[in-house]
């Protein structure tokens, strides 16, 4: 929590402080305490050490424990923690907890303790700070153990469980989660609907633990139970966590569509909560779009459109653009120029599948005109190793997407040419029909006429050049497999030049 936030809380707290006393001495004393408190606040930024002494002097001015002493201790503890004076912070926090039973109201004390623990949690960034935070939680739980404040007990325990998750102390976390689950149940063992919000927070903690430990079986069961909770109005950040882990679970199962749906919901919830994790999850959303081989731009939705030009996401924007254009070289260039994309272990783990899809499509596009080529030819043009080129070609052959044979000794690939004779004959009949149609409508009719009657008509038949007649890819592929070659005739043509089939490339 920032200092500004703290000022706001203090301002709100001070609504409780207006008391009207008849004794002038008491009024003078209160004014002196109040002045000391606000003087300390004025110097806390420029001179925090002196401010701590001033804040700690406030409780001593009160005859009985009261609001001003409570506030002074709060401010001193936060400054001590910020300056790394952890033992002093723990000592004064122990003193602060003596105020909560009688000196201040229950609601005010609960709110203040919660805010204090949030401040400590957000400011912890090293092992000593974590140890201090754990002591704060322990002192809080001991202080409220014999009180009837179950709400604060639950909140503090959940914070402690979150600390153990961050420190990967899964044994401690599992015990604490089981204890909290029992606290959120009725006597018959069923979930208590009145504690649905706490229950979702527990599910979120467990789901994160099982996601980190790769226990997908338990993760899936908890994920489904969490989505069935209807008795709570959860914080959007909690739902963002649950959906993010659900998306990762679906990714591990290669269920790209469900993963995309969960990542989108996670992004939407993080965005609503103002969490910076929305940027990372948006990257995951882009990743699933590529894994789905979708042509839909993930930045076209109303929720994601504002982030399309965000510099933190620009690398992923360029990546999906290159992917959807089937531009393997642009795709590889984006990855090489933005190594931070692979800094996320989850993206690094799954981007290989996208890269392989890109290289597979690039190879199919590259070899389309040829009946014979070498592995080194592919390696050179796609910029991959010969081993990977052979691996991808083997996959295409086994998947019946390429009818070819690999000669490993010579490193040569020969595309088979006689696999579909019947279909080729049908294609030739279709070509004959096109020739007849051309004669009727253009040559013998009133339509456009070909002035260059001496121009070759292509593929050994009379009629127009078929490479200009709009042959589809399948037809062209069949003609390649039969060994036919298109040639541009006319002046200046060299043998083997022009559009069409190349029988060998080494």
Swiss-Prot record:
Protein family according to the UniProt entry: Belongs to the CSN2 family.
Region annotation (Disordered) ranges: 482-506
Record localization: Cytoplasm; Nucleus
Biased composition (Gly residues): 492-506
A Gene Ontology term for the protein's cellular component: COP9 signalosome
Subunit structure: Component of the COP9 signalosome (CSN) complex.
PANTHER family: 26S PROTEASOME NON-ATPASE REGULATORY SUBUNIT 11/COP9 SIGNALOSOME COMPLEX SUBUNIT 2
Biased composition (Basic residues): 482-491
Source species, domain of life: Eukaryota
GN (gene name): csnB
Main location: cytoplasm
UniProt keywords, alphabetically: Cytoplasm, Nucleus, Signalosome
UniProt xrefs under PROSITE patterns: PCI
Sequence ranges assigned to domain PCI in this UniProt record: 252-420
Organism lineage string: Eukaryota, Fungi, Dikarya, Ascomycota, Pezizomycotina
Role, per record: Component of the COP9 signalosome (CSN) complex that acts as an regulator of the ubiquitin (Ubl) conjugation pathway by mediating the deneddylation of the cullin subunit of SCF-type E3 ubiquitin-protein ligase complexes. The CSN complex seems to link protein degradation to sexual development. Required for fruit body formation.
GO biological process entries: cleistothecium development; protein deneddylation
Organism: Emericella nidulans (strain FGSC A4 / ATCC 38163 / CBS 112.46 / NRRL 194 / M139)
Any Pfam family matching the protein: PCI
Protein's UniProt name: COP9 signalosome complex subunit 2
């Amino acid at each position: 929590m920032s200092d500004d936030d703290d000022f706001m809380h203090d301002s709100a707290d001070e609504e409780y402080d207006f008391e009207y006393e008849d004794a002038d001495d008491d009024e003078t004393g209160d004014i002196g305490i109040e002045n000391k408190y606000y003087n300390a606040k004025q110097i806390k930024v420029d001179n925090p050490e002196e401010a701590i002494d001033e804040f700690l002097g406030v409780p001593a001015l009160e005859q009985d424990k009261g609001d001003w002493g409570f506030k002074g201790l709060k401010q001193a503890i936060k400054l001590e923690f910020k300056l790394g004076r952890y033992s002093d912070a723990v000592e004064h926090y122990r003193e602060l907890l003596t105020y909560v039973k009688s000196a201040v109201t229950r609601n005010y004390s609960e709110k203040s303790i919660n805010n204090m623990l949030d401040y400590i949690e957000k400011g912890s960034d090293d092992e000593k700070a974590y140890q201090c935070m754990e002591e704060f939680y322990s002192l809080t739980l001991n202080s409220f153990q014999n009180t009837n404040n179950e709400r604060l007990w639950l909140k503090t325990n959940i914070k402690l469980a979150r600390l153990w998750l961050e420190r990967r102390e899964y044994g401690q976390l599992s015990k604490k989660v089981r204890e909290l689950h029992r606290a959120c149940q009725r006597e018959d063992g069923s979930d208590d609907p009145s504690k649905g919000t706490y229950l979702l927070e527990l599910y979120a903690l467990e789901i994160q633990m099982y996601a980190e430990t790769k226990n997908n079986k338990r993760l899936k069961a908890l994920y489904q139970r969490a989505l069935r909770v209807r008795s709570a109005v959860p914080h959007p950040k909690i739902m963002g966590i649950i959906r993010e882990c659900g998306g990762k679970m679906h990714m591990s199962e290669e269920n790209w569509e469900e993963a995309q749906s969960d990542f989108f919901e996670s992004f939407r919830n993080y965005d609503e909560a103002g969490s910076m994790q929305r940027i990372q999850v948006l990257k995951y959303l882009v990743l699933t779009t590529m894994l789905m081989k979708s042509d839909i731009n993930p930045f076209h939705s109303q929720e994601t459109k504002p982030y399309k030009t965000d510099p933190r996401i620009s690398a992923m924007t360029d990546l999906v653009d290159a992917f959807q254009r089937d531009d393997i070289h642009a795709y590889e260039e984006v990855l090489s120029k933005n190594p931070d994309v692979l800094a996320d272990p989850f993206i690094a783990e799954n981007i290989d599948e996208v890269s392989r899809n890109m290289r597979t499509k690039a190879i199919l596009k590259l070899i389309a005109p040829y009946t014979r080529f070498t592995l080194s030819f592919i390696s050179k043009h796609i910029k991959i190793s010969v081993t990977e080129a052979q691996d991808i070609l083997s996959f295409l052959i086994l998947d019946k997407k390429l009818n070819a044979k690999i000669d490993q000794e010579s490193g040569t690939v020969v595309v088979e040419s006689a696999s579909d004779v019947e279909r080729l004959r049908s294609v030739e009949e279709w070509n004959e029909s096109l020739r007849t149609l051309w004669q009727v409508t253009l040559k013998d009719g009133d339509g456009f006429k070909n002035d260059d009657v001496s121009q070759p008509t292509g593929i050994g038949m009379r009629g127009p050049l078929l490479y200009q007649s709009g042959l589809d890819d399948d037809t062209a592929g069949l003609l390649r497999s039969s060994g036919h070659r298109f040639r541009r005739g006319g002046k200046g043509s060299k043998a083997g030049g022009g559009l069409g089939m190349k029988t060998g490339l080494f």
